[in-house]
Amino acid sequence: QVRKAVWEKLSLAEVHRDLISSAKPRIMFFREIASRLSSRGVAVSAGDLNLYSLQLTVQRYIVSRYLEQQCPDILPNLLDAAGISPGSTSLEKFAGTFCRLFPGTEFIEDPTLDPVSWIKADGDRLKLLVSEILILSVAASNKALESFREVIDWNGLLLESSAQEVVEGVESFLTAAPPVAEFGLTLPEILRLPLKAAPLSLFEQLKFMKEQWRQLLPEELLPEIMAAFTLSEEEGRMFMPHGDHEHTAAVLEFGGHTAGSGTNDYYPEPERFSSDTDWMPNVVLLAKMVYVWLGQLSKKYDLEITRLDQIPDAELDLLAEWGVTGLWLIGLWERSPASQHIKQICGNPEAISSAYSLFDYAIAADLGGEEALWRFKEKALKRGIRLASDMVPNHTGLYSKWIIEHPDWFVQLDYPPYPAYRFTGVDLSSNPDISLHIEDGYWERRDAAVVFKHYDHRDGRTRYIYHGNDGSSTPWNDTAQLNYLIPEVREAVIGTILHVARMFPIIRFDAAMTLAKKHYQRLWFPQPGHGGIASRPEHGMTRSEFDAAMPEEFWRQVVDKIATDAPDTLLLAEAFWLMEGYFVRTLGMHRVYNSAFMNMLKLEENAKYRQTIRNVLEFNPQVLQ
C-alpha cells in the first residue's frame, strides 16, 4: 500500500529488488523507507512501518477468510453494489486508477502491465481489490498512521468521483452483509475495532488483533507478529539514554523454571561439580594491572622495570608474606593496536589498548615475551605463588589475527543492518590485506553502531561484523564478536584455552556468562518475539534450530577438556546474571564471581543478600564451597 509517487520519489524499486535478490529480512525495506524519509525531514519509525505491514497482513487475512469461507457467494453482489461488476467499464476505470496510484510490486517491476488484464487473469484478484479498498478506507481514519501518512495517503484516489462511489458502495454493502460469525459484528466494524481500542498506537492495535482475533489467525503468522513487537521495542531502547532506569539486584533463586513455560530458555541443571586439587581451596588471589604495576614498582624501587622478569624478588617476597598464593596479571597478552588508535583519536593521547581487546594469545613483546614470563613464573612458584591470566573467549580485538585469517568466524552480515550507517573514517587495520572502519557515529559521538566494516582486499568482499556486546550498554567498539554456532570457532577457542592452561595454572574467563547457551541465543539469535542485541531479532532462531547448531554447552566442553588435558588448572568464571549456581554446579567451573554480593553490597541490600545465601544453602550447600 505504498503510493506510486513515494516509490518513485524514494527510489524504492531498487531497494525492493535488492531485498529480494539478497534475501534480506523484510525489516530492511522499512528501514530504508524510514531512512530516506528522515533524510527529507520526515521522522518515521521503521518499527511502525513494520507494525503496519503486519496489520495489513492480518486485515487481508480476515477479509479473505470472510469472502472465501463464510460468504463465498457474496462477491458478485458486492461488486454490483460498488458499481464495478466484472466486464464493466467502471471496473476498468477504477482498476486502472487504483493500480496507477497504489501499484503492487508487479506493476513496479513491469510498468507496461495492464491492470484490467492482470485482474482478469485470476479471479481471486477481484477479492484482493475489494480487500485493498476496504483496508485503505479503514486506514484513512487511523490516527496512528500520521507520521507516515504520505506513504499511504489515498486522497488522490478519492478525487476521482467514481472511485469515491466505489469505496462507499463497498462499505455500505459490507455494513449490511452478514456479520463475521465469530464476533457478531460486520466486517467494517471488526476492522475498525483496533483503532477504537488504541487510536494512537500501532503497537497496541496489532496487539489487540493478536489477542482478540487469535482464533482466526494462522499459526505461522504469530512469530512474525511477535518479531514485529520485538523490533518496535528495540527501536524504543535505542533512543533511551543508558542508565536512565533504576538498577536493582535480584535475589538468587532455584527451581523456578519448568521446561516449556514462557520463553523456551530452560536448560537441564544436572549436578556435575568439578573437584578441587589440593592447592585450589587455599588460593588467595591478588589482581594486578600489569603495566600499571610495573610503573608503580619502577617508582618504588627506583629502577626501570618494564619486563616481567625484572620484577624484584623483594616484591614477590612481600606478596608471599601477605599470604598471596595467586597473582592475576591483567594485560599480558598481545593487544589489538586498533583499540589504542580509537582511544587516541577520541582524545586520549596517552591511552594504550584495552586488555580485553586482543590481537593474539602471545605474551606481549614489550613485557619480555614468553621467555620473561617463564622466568618470572619460576621465581613466583618458588614462593608458593601461582600465576593467573585472563582468557577472553567472547570476542577478539577489532584488529586481530583471526580477523585477518578467519573473517568468517565472526557474527556478521553482508550489508549494514541500519541504512544510515556510514564508514568513512580512518582505516584501523595494520595489515594491507584488509581495511577496518568503525561507524562514523563513534567519531562524531552521536551513535554507537553494532557493526564495523571489514573490507578484504584479497577477494573484494565487504563484511559488516558485529562488535562484542553483552547487551547491557553500548557495544565494545574495539572488539569483534565470535560466532559460536560455527563448530570450528568452538574448537579453535578450546584450543586457545588449552594453550593458556599450559602457561597458567589459574585462568579467569572474561564475560563467561555471555557464552552460556541461553544467553548466547538471547543476545545473538533470539527466539521469535524476544529481543537481543540491536538488529539481531530479525536473525533469530527457534530453540530447536539453535540447539541443532549449538548442541552442547560450550563451557561444559571446556571443563571436560581441561579435566583430561590440563587437570591441575583452576577455572574461574566471570558469570553474572544470576548464573553463579549453574556455572559451578552444572558447568563445572571451580570458582565463579559472586555478582549478588557485589551488587547488593553496592546497593546496601543486606536483606536480599541474606535471602540469597539461604536460598543457596537450601538448594545445594556445595555451591558455596
Q: Language model features by range: what are they?
A:
Residues 324, 358, 386-388, 479, ...:
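Extracellular structured ligand-interaction cores
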